[in-house]
Design a protein with these regions (language model features):
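Bacterial N-terminal signal peptides that target proteins for export
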Residues: 1-10
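C-terminal motif of bacterial Sec signal peptides marking the signal peptidase cleavage site
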Residues: 17-19
Length: 361
């Protein structure tokens, strides 16, 4: 099972849907595809309308984000905090495909192949909204740090230590991971940096899912180390990843080959969310570097979108396949409320890390 969050509108175009279309919505709108021995179906679940979702209260409680490790107290204690880079990654496509072959009833001398796939994309969010959330998230972290009594570097100070850091052109990059040719899941996303804390190459999740990930991480660690050396404080480079859908796929080939793929709209803080930190340990030469990783995906139970889906079956008893295309149509005001709940919870978890190392903070 894969869980994720993302916007096709980021790429400036909604998902194109063909065939017979049914529009549905609700707390968990679902699109599924199933291929069995001799039939295939595509379905979409129902629930709340866009009007009902838009009428929900504007604020949402911060999501309970947690990390799987902690910043060492020797690095976090009694240091000025610098946040030279802050990124938000928006998942905008999630696809799943199941392939199953054979089975005792699969045919004479070789069996048959069944496949089911679901392709999803997030729509309904204006491009400028994504940038606004990134800017808000960065400002919120600084505000939470100051409210906790932690000294925070000014924008000028943070910019000065990052003057030689390799910035990402356009303060944005696109990424993808996974594949579905032989079954499995794939994810696409776009990462934007806060305008006051632009993305630094190697600290922004580029290369994730590919062979360049290791090289990007090496460059990012070197950049973080240089910034920490220059600052004399604690450098933080947060990366928040937001998802919009859960996708899953499964297949079996016991009696008859079957394949299933499903997508359910759900907002969440997704894996890939992390904080790179660096600071010089007392008595040591170069600065130490580490990463806080998200302990687990953090979903919200609140509805934020409807779903439009189309699909059907194709093939015959020796090779049946189904495919569903689904657009998760976000209600922007509700999505924004959940995005704010996500960054507030993420930032609160960062602040808690520092407070734990500073008993008086």
């Amino acid at each position: 099972m894969a869980r994720a969050t993302t916007p096709i509108i980021l790429l400036a175009a909604p998902l194109l849907l063909g065939g017979c279309m049914a529009t549905t919505g609700g707390p968990a709108p679902t699109a599924g595809a199933q291929a069995g021995f001799a039939s295939g179906v595509a379905t979409a679940g129902g629930g709340l309308s866009a009007t009902q979702i838009a009428a929900m209260p504007g604020e949402a409680a911060p999501l309970p984000v947690g990390f799987s490790s902690a910043i060492p107290a020797s690095l976090a204690a009694a240091r000025k905090v610098f946040v030279p880079a802050y990124g938000v990654s928006y998942i905008h496509t999630q696809n799943a495909r199941a392939v199953s072959q054979g089975g005792l009833m699969g045919g004479f001398g070789g069996g048959s192949t069944r496949s089911a796939s679901v392709r999803t994309g997030l729509t309904g969010i204006a491009p400028e909204t994504f940038q606004r959330i990134a800017d808000e998230a960065h400002a919120d972290l600084l505000a939470q740090l100051r409210a906790a009594g932690i000294e925070v570097a000014t924008a000028e100070e943070a910019g000065a230590i990052a003057a030689s850091a390799p910035r990402i052109a356009g303060n944005a990059h696109d990424g993808s991971a996974g594949g579905t040719m032989l079954g499995g899941q794939s994810t696409g996303w776009r990462t934007l940096g806060a305008q006051a804390a632009p993305l630094v190459s190697g600290l922004s999740g580029e290369g994730a899912g590919g062979g360049l990930a290791g090289l990007a991480a090496i460059g990012g660690n070197q950049a973080a180390q240089r910034m920490a050396d220059a600052s004399g404080g604690l450098v933080l480079a947060p990366l928040l990843r937001l998802d919009y859908v859960n996708v899953s796929s499964s297949g079996r080939s016991l009696l008859a080959a079957t394949a299933n793929a499903e997508a359910t709209a759900q907002f969440s803080v997704a894996p890939g969310t992390a904080v790179t930190y660096a600071a010089r340990r007392q008595g040591m030469g170069a600065s130490d570097i580490g990463t806080l990783q998200l302990a687990a995906s953090v979903p919200s139970a609140e509805p934020f979108a409807t779903m439009a889906a189309s699909g059907g079956a194709a093939g015959n008893w020796v090779g049946l396949g189904t495919r569903t295309d689904a657009a998760v149509q976000a209600v922007e005001a509700r999505w924004v409320a959940l995005a704010r709940a996500a960054y507030r919870g993420f930032n609160a978890a960062i602040v808690q890390q520092l407070r734990a190392a500073r008993p008086t903070a």
